[in-house]
Amino acid sequence: MESLLAPITSRIRGIYSPSELALVERAFERADSAHAGQLRKSGDPYITHPVAVAEILVEFGLDAPTLAAALLHDCVEDTNYSLDELRREFGDEVANLVDGVTKLDRLTYGPTAEAETVRKMVVAMAKDIRVLVIKLADRLHNARTWQFVNPESASRKGQETLDIYAPLAHRLGMNAVKWELEDLSFKYTEPKKYEEIERLVAERSPSRDKLTNEVVRDVQADLENENIESSVTGRQKHLYSIYQKMLVRGRAFDDIYDLVGIRVLVEDVRDCYAVLGAIHARWSPVPGRFKDYIAMPKMNLYQSLHTTVIGPNGKAVEIQIRTHEMHRRAEYGIAAHWKYKLDGRKSGATSDSPDVLWLKQLQIGRAHV
């Protein structure tokens, strides 16, 4: 079974210290032993779940105690391994993280509960922000395997995720997690609507992709002429986001899906505004659609320039412009702090970085997240 851990150890070896690597390996061995003989609904050995949760956290760049806690997070709840034993073997930091996740697992969410109240309870109960990040990774992997549970249970868990966990991911700035949780939940709460939008997307994709590629080529050519190093890509449309816009705006699918979106990533803030100037020189901006979230970041530290222009063939094009660092934070949110911290061992991360200051604010005001 140790080969299960290989994708994790190969990623963290050389980044974690030998003692940190040993901590993660010991946590895996204990979890593997504690869950011996247990199976998931899919028929896979239970240990595959905590390992998958830890893999998600490795992608975020979380620290060694968090990975250890992720590997052990179901032991106290689902095996004979007690919290006291865990504390003696792994210390207070890992034990407190596991205890925090266990308490969240025991929180019940009924049909009469106010989602906002439950979200505040979840945040207030987590004395360490890392508990919330582990719980989100736990919910994400479970959501990826809902096809193995009965439809009623999957639908119930999907609604709970839309009400509590996806908004929580958004408030923590973890947009990559939020979008995947929303799409997976949508698939099981509204299967017919999900399939219909999925079908429409598949039908319209060729023509939309053609226009997207044309816009990307034009922007790349302009930026090369300006000697601006950049990465220009089309932006994926998420099915749940399309559905929500259809509901809220009362618009037809074609009105929403046909709107082409691209993202431009550059090295520094000065280049962001240079890119904006180059794009507005090529295409006319739509009045009232420019947002400067670089000068005025969102509460979760999201930063980007947003503009909508009238592109080729008179089609509206939504464009996001930001630095690679801003994109990292936009994707991973609060989890980006630990990735920054790990990277900073070699690059000299400082305690007054925006990530660290934001983390301090969240720790002080958890109940208001």
Task: Give the predicted meaning of each segment.
Residues M1-V317, R322-R366:
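Active-site helical microenvironments for divalent-metal-assisted chemistry
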